Structures are given as structure tokens and as C-alpha cells.
From Swiss-Prot:
Binding site for FMN: S23, K47, G48, N101, N128, K166, I192, G218, G244, G245, G266, T267
Protein name per UniProt: Dihydroorotate dehydrogenase B (NAD(+)), catalytic subunit
Stored Pfam families: DHO_dh
Gene Ontology biological process terms in this record: 'de novo' pyrimidine nucleobase biosynthetic process; 'de novo' UMP biosynthetic process
Chief place where the protein resides: cytoplasm
Cofactor note: Binds 1 FMN per subunit.
Domain of life: Bacteria
Gene Ontology CC terms, in alphabetical order: cytoplasm
Amino acid sequence: MTRRNMGVHIAGIQLKNPVMTASGTFGSGREYSEFVDLNQLGAVVVKGVANEPWSGNPTPRIAETYGGMLNSVGLQNPGVEAFIKDDIQFLRQYDTKIIVNIAGRTVADYCKVTEKLGDADIDLIELNISCPNVKAGGVNFGTNPAMVEEVTKAVKKVARQPLIVKLTPNVTDIVEIAKAAVAGGADAISLINTLLGMAIDIHGRKPILANVVGGLSGPAIKPVALRMVYQVANAVQVPIIGMGGIATGEDAIAFMLAGATGVAVGTANFMNPRATMEVLEGIEDYMDQYNIEDIHEIIGKL
């Protein structure tokens, strides 16, 4: 096989290849390390961490659906200080970049967790703006352009690592939201997060999820994700990380053709612990098939 250039830059950080994990589906990599050589990944995006521990939502909080799954886990996490103490040293054993996804209930929450990560040995921060803003009546930060710009600007001001902003698809105009994130100082954009959905137990006549609604992920959302990645990539000048239903190399290639510089594998990890490796191998096979020497010959070449 001919040597191919798989390297990409995300917000000025060099990744050996475009394949990474999607936050919330890979923990901090420990559970998967016996199945996956973490050294082969472009980056590990860890499960979201907050300034303080979060207990998450009541159970049941996972439901299978046709072509995917619903989750209402509620960003359960031990807090940023426990993450720094327990997980960074483990990940630094591997030759991969570390991206920390952060969550918050207020702008101040986001800033506090970012400040605590300032001296941590990590590479990038991913700002999850799909959280409800408790100071704005519970409206999700990511659904209002003004709030997106405000929280991005505040976090960017205190961040010591490059900042990725992760967009929710539960909006009318994804381009408007992406532009607000860039105006606030986002160095890169990742999308999409989960689509809001619901499942009903027709025999018990009640919602299957205790939280009633949850986030839909998996193959079912891929067409929506591709459309939004394509729209955003054509509207902003920062790198895009595409996700939403990626399970094969062919899926990843489609996202890169639509304009994504990086691709994140999420729900597929639950069904196949080696999904990230198979996606990477699939990209390499595609490059060999079409005699592509550099990954950039694919990105945005629709």
C-alpha cells in the first residue's frame, strides 16, 4: 500500500488522521483500550465534564430505535477535578490528541471548568452548548444565536487551549448558529449533536424514557448531519468536525466531501467497539482505490 498523508489540522493542532471519538460514547477511553489501539486515533474526545459532579437523569435513560438510539443520560460526570486527577494521565500514555468536552448550566459554570483545565495537559476544548441555561428559563444555549456568541466569547476569553464549539441540530437555521459561534471566537465547529426524540411504551401507555424526551443518534440522523455540515462548511472559514451516524469509512468520506476536516464516531462504538478502527481502515481503502495521496484531496470536494 502506498503511504498516504492522513494528517489534518483542527484549530492549529495537528492530528495524525481525521478520525476521533464522539463525546459521551467512549468514556475516557479506558473501557475501549483493550479493543482499540488508541495510538491509531487522531483524537479522543472524552465524555463531557462540568465544574461540579452531575448525577444525570433518572432511569430508564436509554431506548433503542430503528436506525439508532435515544439517550437522556443527562451528562452524568464526576466533575472536572476528578477528570484531571484520574483520566488525563491515562490518556497521555497514548500518541493521540485529547479533546475535553465541557458542560455547564450557566456562562459562569462554563468559564469555571475552562479555567480549571487551563494548566491541564490537554490539546483542545469542545464546548457543548446543548445544555439548558438555567438563568434564561432553561432555554438551551445552542438554540439562540445571541447566547451562543455570549457563551463562546466568555469561554474563549479564559481558555488556554483552542476552542471547538459543538452545535445542536435542534434549530431552524444552523448557519446562523455557526456564524454566532465564530463571531464569539470559535476556532472550530463540531456538529451535529443529537436530535430531540421520544419513544412510547404502547402497552404501558407511557414514555419509555423517564425524562420523556432524549437525544436521537445513530444512522437515522446521518442525512440531517450531512446537510448541516455541508451548509456550515460553506458559510464559515473555521475547520469542521462532522458527526452523526458515522459507522463506516464510506460514511466518513461523505462527511469529508461535504466539508468536514475531522470525523467523530459515536453511537457505532456501542454496537462495535472497533468502529473507529474500521472507519479509519475504510478511509485508507478509499484513498487507495482512487489513488488519493493526501486527505485534503477529499475535504470539501463535493
